[in-house]
From Swiss-Prot:
Subunit structure: Homodimer. Part of the ribosomal stalk of the 50S ribosomal subunit. Forms a multimeric L10(L12)X complex, where L10 forms an elongated spine to which 2 to 4 L12 dimers bind in a sequential fashion. Binds GTP-bound translation factors.
GO molecular function terms noted in the UniProt entry: mRNA binding; structural constituent of ribosome
Organism in which the protein naturally occurs: Cronobacter sakazakii (strain ATCC BAA-894)
Cellular component terms per the entry's GO annotation: cytosolic large ribosomal subunit
Family, as annotated: Belongs to the bacterial ribosomal protein bL12 family.
Record's protein name: Large ribosomal subunit protein bL12
Coiled-coil portions: none
Claim: Nucleus is one of the keywords in the record: no
UniProt xrefs under PANTHER family: 39S RIBOSOMAL PROTEIN L12 (PTHR45987), LARGE RIBOSOMAL SUBUNIT PROTEIN BL12M (PTHR45987:SF4)
Pfam families referenced in this protein's UniProt entry, alphabetically: Ribosomal_L12, Ribosomal_L12_N
Record flagged with keyword Ribosomal protein: yes
Length: 122
């Protein structure tokens, strides 16, 4: 019996952010590919016709000099535990939040930059 796409999607949606990061790393090793390359190819696709973007992704590019403050800010923003937040900060660049409003994304970016992190909103 094989697993369906819906079952895989359901299993991944129940995972924590850190589990998904580990899954992606394992898949990159197993298949000899890079998820970053897939994102670059997808971004190079045809642009949407002047439609204003309503959902944004907040990407932690680098922790900066004050990693402890950044970990605290990540914990506050995501609700992750200490270990998960630390692992996420150390695995930068990493997506912190996806599909958030522009106001929420900008507020999160501001709080993380005040803690010393390098953040990008896409």
């Amino acid at each position: 019996m094989s697993i369906t796409k819906d079952q895989i999607i359901e299993a991944v949606s129940a995972m924590s952010v850190m589990d998904v990061v580990e899954l992606i790393s394992a898949m990159e090793e197993k298949f000899g590919v890079s998820a970053a390359a897939a994102v670059a190819v997808a971004a190079a696709g045809p642009a949407e016709a002047a439609e204003e973007k309503t959902e944004f992704d907040v990407i932690l590019k680098a922790a900066g000099a004050n990693k402890v403050a950044v970990i605290k800010a990540v914990r506050g923003a995501t609700g992750l535990g200490l270990k998960e937040a630390k692992d996420l900060v150390e695995s930068a660049p990493a997506a912190l939040k996806e599909g958030v409003s522009k106001d929420d994304a900008e507020a999160l970016k501001k709080s993380l930059e005040e803690a010393g992190a390098e953040v990008e909103v896409k």
